[in-house]
């Protein structure tokens, strides 16, 4: 039963991650990510590697604004829990609009995450995606 509760908590954690990005809510994002978070985004047209909560907050602060915004839908999670750690694979469908560059990106990717339980709360320890299209 505990494993099912942990999986549900991790699903809600990932939902808050996407909502934090899409609403530019850095305070919410900070509650989702571990202090030593590692993030990697891999696409044919860009690559980002981010280490630590401060670098992550700076990245999201600059990447998503009132002129650069997105919609992230994560679904069909595959989550495995092992005590106070867990892994997850999620499909992503997203849309990113950049008014400054007058571009729209839409596509899909596979997120691969590692989670850790800190003081009784799940946090994203490592996250990132590889673009599928």
Predicted features and spans:
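A beta-strand edge to alpha-helix "cap/lid" segment located at domain peripheries
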Residues: 62-133
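A solvent-exposed, acidic/Ser-Thr-rich amphipathic alpha-helical stretch
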Residues: 26-91
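Short, low-complexity N-terminal intrinsically disordered segments enriched in polar/charged residues
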Residues: 1-23, 27-31, 35
């Amino acid at each position: 039963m505990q494993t099912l509760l942990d999986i549900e908590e991790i699903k809600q954690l990932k939902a808050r991650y996407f909502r934090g990005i899409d609403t530019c809510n850095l305070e919410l994002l900070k509650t989702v990510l571990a202090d030593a978070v590692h993030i990697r985004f891999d696409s044919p047209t860009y690559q980002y590697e981010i280490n630590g909560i401060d670098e992550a907050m700076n990245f999201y602060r600059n990447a998503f604004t009132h002129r650069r915004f997105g919609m992230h839908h994560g679904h069909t999670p595959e989550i495995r829990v092992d005590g106070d750690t867990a892994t997850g694979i999620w499909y992503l469908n997203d849309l990113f609009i950049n008014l400054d560059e007058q571009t729209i990106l839409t596509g899909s990717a596979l997120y691969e995450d590692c989670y850790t339980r800190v003081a009784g709360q799940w946090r994203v320890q490592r996250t990132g995606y590889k673009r599928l299209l």
